């Protein structure tokens, strides 16, 4: 039995339960058809202004049917090209070992990309770099 009066509370993006990890994807964890049948959908955001703005922007594109690619969405939001290539590392569905080439790109991002978003993502990028050095 489907109940449309149910509100969905999504903790996918929250960072308080695992402070080393930032989850981010093109809302791959949601079924749009299921979501459309619900009364409300709440996103428990990160508390980081630029990251939350990116998540809300991403959600808007998700609701509109992903009319642009994830890469284009990230470019629109001025993410570093190396970070765009590595964005899959933030999707918890991907349990990947970080390669040497990916770790080199992470180091470049940390050294060369300057953005308010980078300031918020620095601890998560640093954690990925440490994972890649193991």
Mark where each language-model region is.
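C-terminal functional modules
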Residues: 63-134
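Catalytic-core regions of glycoside hydrolase
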Residues: 1-61
């Amino acid at each position: 039995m489907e109940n449309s009066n149910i509100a969905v509370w999504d903790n996918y993006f929250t960072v308080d339960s695992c402070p080393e990890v930032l989850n981010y994807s093109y809302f791959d964890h949601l079924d749009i058809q299921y979501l459309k049948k619900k009364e409300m959908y709440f996103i428990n955001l990160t508390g980081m202004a630029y990251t939350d703005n990116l998540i809300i922007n991403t959600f808007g594109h998700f609701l509109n049917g992903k009319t642009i690619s994830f890469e284009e969405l990230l470019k629109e939001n001025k993410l570093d090209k190396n970070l765009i290539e590595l964005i899959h590392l933030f999707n918890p569905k991907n349990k990947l070992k970080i390669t040497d080439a990916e770790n080199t790109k992470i180091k470049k991002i940390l050294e060369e990309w300057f953005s308010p978003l980078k300031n918020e993502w620095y601890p998560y990028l640093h954690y990925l770099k440490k994972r890649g050095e193991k």
